[in-house]
Amino acid sequence: MTNTRKSHPLIKIVNHSFIDLPAPSNISAWWNFGSLLGVCLGLQILTGLFLAMHYTADTTTAFSSVAHICRDVNYGWLIRYLHANGASMFFIFLYFHIGRGIYYGSYTFMDTWNIGVLLLFAVMATAFMGYVLPWGQMSFWGATVITNLLSAIPYIGPTLVEWIWGGFSVDKATLTRFFAFHFILPFIITAMVMIHLLFLHETGSNNPSGMNSDSDKIPFHPYYTIKDILGALFMMIMLMSLVMFTPDLLGDPDNYTPANPLNTPPHIKPEWYFLFAYAILRSIPNKLGGVLALASSILILTLFPIIHLSKQRSMSFRPFSQCLMWLLVANLLILTWIGGQPVEHPFIIIGQLASVTYFFTILILMPSTALMEDKLLKW
């Protein structure tokens, strides 16, 4: 008789995805982030569900309902801070996951890569709308500034913004719809994750060498299940340390002031994980240009499979490309720092230089360096 694990119509799907899945024998800790993102998504949905039980999506009571969750609900403070800091962990892992994909050439799996870019957009949209819900000063003004960017779209822009707002400013209608979208999007993300995995399992995982590993595969369980559990344990230690000791470290103090349309905060800025894109947006002194640069900074990821000119897939054996990769990481850290600074000298020029360097590195330096390395190897 066949093992139920291999014959049951539902269980065999799980079996082929997480148990008997042939995996490369040499994948490093950089391959842990996919499963960690799955853990983060599960945690966010779970904590979000409990928060939604006590939250009210109304401009008059939203701020008070969050205060009520923290003060009066059993372990409400824990659920709220797990959710807020869980989002930060989510983005840290997302950026590591994407960075790993760029370094090891995983973007050559085009279907998996492109659905991944769509996932990034969906997660960013969800996080942005979630930040609006506590209805603090930064929630309100962040929503106003970012939604207002759409007015730069020619002809339909102003109408589109009013349509999204549900009125002539960010108000009750905006908050209600943002809550509705913030609730539904994680489930859409979960479905997209399944498609992401479906495409991945069509090809199998990449590995640090960038070469075909069909001749050297091991079963996912127990090797990578135990490795993923260890990764999740480290993640929980980091997250719980953050939540228990410095829960507001990554937040903005302005968000502890209830939203006031008559009083603008001195520095409007998004959460830390959007600062690099915000810096690129601000570095162009033109509304439409800034919006296009902002969109391009993420959409540029879809070009990686096209601008990959090296005959090697991975950067493991390409020292010059490695230098450029770390230059890009440093550049993104500079952009993140600039995004949180006021718009004044010298931050303006630093932001503009870093923005130019970002696009120049990806579009010009990386492909030309790849060609140079092939030449040096006489390929």
From Swiss-Prot:
Lipid bilayer topology: Multi-pass membrane protein
Residues annotated for a ubiquinone binding in this entry: 201
Transmembrane residue ranges: 33-53, 77-98, 113-133, 178-198, 226-246, 288-308, 320-340, 347-367
Keywords: Electron transport, Heme, Iron, Membrane, Metal-binding, Mitochondrion, Mitochondrion inner membrane, Respiratory chain, Transmembrane, Transmembrane helix, Transport, Ubiquinone
Binding residues annotated for heme b b566, in chain numbering: 97, 196
Subcellular localization(s) per the UniProt record: Mitochondrion inner membrane
InterPro entries: Cyt_b/b6_C, Cyt_b/b6_C_sf, Cyt_b/b6_N, Cytb/b6-like_sf, Cytochrome_b, Cytochrome_b_C_euk/bac, Cytochrome_b_N_euk/bac, Di-haem_cyt_TM
GO cellular component terms, semicolon-separated: mitochondrial inner membrane; respiratory chain complex III
Cofactor needs: heme b
Residues bound to heme b b562: 83, 182
Pfam families: Cytochrom_B_C (PF00032), Cytochrome_B (PF00033)
Cofactor, how bound (note): Binds 2 heme b groups non-covalently.
The organism's place on the tree of life at top rank: Eukaryota
GO annotation terms (biological process): mitochondrial electron transport, ubiquinol to cytochrome c
A GO molecular-function descriptor: ubiquinol-cytochrome-c reductase activity
Coiled-coil residue spans: none
Misc note: Heme 1 (or BL or b562) is low-potential and absorbs at about 562 nm, and heme 2 (or BH or b566) is high-potential and absorbs at about 566 nm.
Annotated family: Belongs to the cytochrome b family.
Its job: Component of the ubiquinol-cytochrome c reductase complex (complex III or cytochrome b-c1 complex) that is part of the mitochondrial respiratory chain. The b-c1 complex mediates electron transfer from ubiquinol to cytochrome c. Contributes to the generation of a proton gradient across the mitochondrial membrane that is then used for ATP synthesis.
Subunit: The cytochrome bc1 complex contains 11 subunits: 3 respiratory subunits (MT-CYB, CYC1 and UQCRFS1), 2 core proteins (UQCRC1 and UQCRC2) and 6 low-molecular weight proteins (UQCRH/QCR6, UQCRB/QCR7, UQCRQ/QCR8, UQCR10/QCR9, UQCR11/QCR10 and a cleavage product of UQCRFS1). This cytochrome bc1 complex then forms a dimer.
Record's protein name: Cytochrome b
Record organism: Ctenomys frater
